């Protein structure tokens, strides 16, 4: 625990539990009246390019999402406690997993407990919090098929499975058993793609191939409408489909092409919005990498530092040192990057729009 008291540990973790689903969504959930600007707040604070209401009223939507979120958090904490984790530790760890903030009680994070059972519970738990919470509402409505038919969900788990398999094949000679290799691969893929940042092993000792896979996952992130950060799986899917359609259009000029997500045509406005977000995202990452390179660190270190801070993950690749290797100026810039990345850029601008605060 270092020098932090239990009260400070709790407050730190509670802050990212509330922030995981969005402080503004939390405020909307407890508001009494529906005012102008709430739709923009909800749209901005629920990450991803496509915003959907699970019920007619935005206030009720926010309340339902938070009920699902907090219920999953309680279940997560109870399961960890039943697996042998002390009750305080289970609450702190569940907060870190639910909010995908990754703060733990001990400096060695999940590795402190030396328990495969706890490791797998944390792995699966963090993955579930990287899923779009609107999909869990389908489960409550007993519309299970809609949950499993979701295109982003299937892509999300496919990325996890493929990444875990590739890293497992790349590192299985490092550890004493195949079981350990799979455990570490699965855990690190889960904690990175969900931008949680829990620790279990020293990933800087892994081959560069595995580290670059993790770097790619840092950029992709979790699902839209989840507590995970990153670019989001749905945006990556849309970009890939736009690229495919543009390629086909060059080969078959007379062919009429449309972009579908979950069987529905995605409008041009949303496609353009995703492309604009990609442009801003890439510009910020390149700017961060350029500025951080002034500290004379190698490409993997500065790129992972940019990805880790802007996507709110935590781990640093390419070195066993911490972020202390960077200059005070770089740390200040990375601090601003963490704020902008957590808010997905646009909500930061939303705060300064008069329409958001209008009472009429």
Where are these regions (language model features)?
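Membrane-proximal intracellular helices of multi-pass ion channels
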Residues: 1-360
């Amino acid at each position: 625990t270092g020098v932090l008291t239990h009260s400070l540990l709790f407050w730190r973790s509670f802050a990212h539990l509330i922030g995981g689903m969005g402080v503004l969504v939390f405020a909307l959930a407890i508001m009494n009246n529906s005012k102008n600007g709430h739709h923009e707040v909800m749209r901005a604070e629920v990450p991803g390019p496509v915003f959907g209401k699970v019920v007619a009223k935005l206030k009720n939507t926010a309340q339902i999402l938070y009920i699902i979120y907090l219920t999953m958090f309680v279940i997560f904490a109870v399961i960890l406690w039943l697996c042998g984790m002390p009750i305080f530790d289970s609450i702190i760890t569940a907060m870190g997993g639910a909010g995908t903030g990754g703060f733990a009680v001990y400096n060695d994070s999940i590795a402190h407990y030396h328990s495969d059972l706890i490791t797998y519970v944390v792995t699966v738990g963090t993955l579930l919090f990287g899923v779009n919470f609107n999909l869990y509402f389908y489960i409550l409505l007993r519309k299970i098929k809609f949950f499993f038919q979701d295109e982003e969900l299937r892509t999300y788990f496919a990325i996890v499975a493929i990444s875990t398999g590739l890293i497992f094949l790349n590192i299985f000679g490092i550890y004493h058993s195949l079981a350990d290799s799979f455990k570490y691969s699965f855990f690190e893929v889960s904690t990175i793609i969900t931008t949680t940042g829990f620790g279990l092993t020293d990933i800087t000792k892994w081959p560069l191939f595995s580290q670059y896979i993790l770097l790619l996952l840092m950029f992709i992130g979790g699902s839209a409408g989840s507590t995970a950060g990153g670019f989001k799986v749905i945006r990556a899917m849309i970009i890939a489909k736009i690229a495919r359609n543009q390629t086909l259009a060059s080969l078959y000029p007379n062919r009429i092409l449309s972009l579908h997500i979950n069987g529905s045509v995605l409008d041009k406005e949303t496609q353009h919005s995703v492309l604009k977000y990609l442009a801003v995202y890439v510009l910020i990452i390149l700017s961060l990498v350029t500025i951080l390179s002034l500290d004379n660190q190698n490409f993997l270190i500065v790129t992972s530092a940019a990805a880790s801070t802007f996507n709110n993950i935590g781990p640093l690749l390419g070195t066993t040192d911490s972020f202390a290797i960077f200059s005070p100026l770089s740390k200040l810039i990375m601090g601003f990057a963490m704020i902008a990345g957590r808010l997905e850029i646009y909500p930061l601008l939303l705060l300064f729009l008069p329409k958001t605060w209008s009472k009429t």
